[in-house]
A protein has these predicted regions:
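N-terminal leader/targeting and accessory segments in enzymes
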Residues: 1-77, 81
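Phosphate-binding loop of NTP-binding sites
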Residues: 75-143
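Cationic, low-complexity basic patches in intrinsically disordered or flexible, solvent-exposed regions
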Residues: 147
């Protein structure tokens, strides 16, 4: 994970969609029920990604491709490591109904006094949750605790 985190520190934009590739981004080739992101790794590099993280050895056609056992697991671990290095409190909201609305209300109230970071919309799933902390690349590890 340290190698992947070092790459992330140099190229902090994460993408899981080749339509969203920015210069120097890292493309994570996620798999779904009807798609395999490994098929798009070369395209991501062609579009400007600095690296592509893949989990299919057959997809490795370039030295900028990082082979991992599971791309989703690697993304989740990268997010966990990045979040661990940020000295900011976290607030979690759970329940059956109303989580997104509650999150929006709480974040707006807290934003009156604090700098607040929250998931966009309802990206509160196994993919959206790790994409949230890795988007906080402008925060330095162990800064202040004014963020929520």
């Amino acid at each position: 994970m340290s190698e992947l985190y070092d790459i992330f520190r140099e190229h902090p934009h994460i993408s899981t969609d080749t339509r969203d590739i920015g210069a120097d981004s890292i493309f994570f080739a996620l798999r779904g029920a009807t798609f395999d992101g490994n098929r798009f790794a070369a395209e991501a590099l062609d579009k400007g990604a600095a690296y592509a993280v893949v989990d299919d050895p057959a997809a490795v056609t370039d030295d900028r491709m990082v082979l991992v056992g599971d791309t989703l697991g690697a993304l989740q671990e990268l997010a966990r490591e990045h979040r661990r290095r940020l000295a900011i409190p976290i607030l979690a909201i759970s329940g059956s109904n109303g989580k997104t609305t509650t999150k929006e209300l709480v974040s707006r109230v807290l934003a009156e006094r604090f700098e607040v970071y929250a998931t966009r919309g309802n990206l509160n799933n196994h993919i959206g949750v790790p994409l949230t902390p890795v988007s906080y690349t402008h925060l330095r590890a162990h800064e202040t605790d004014q963020y929520l």
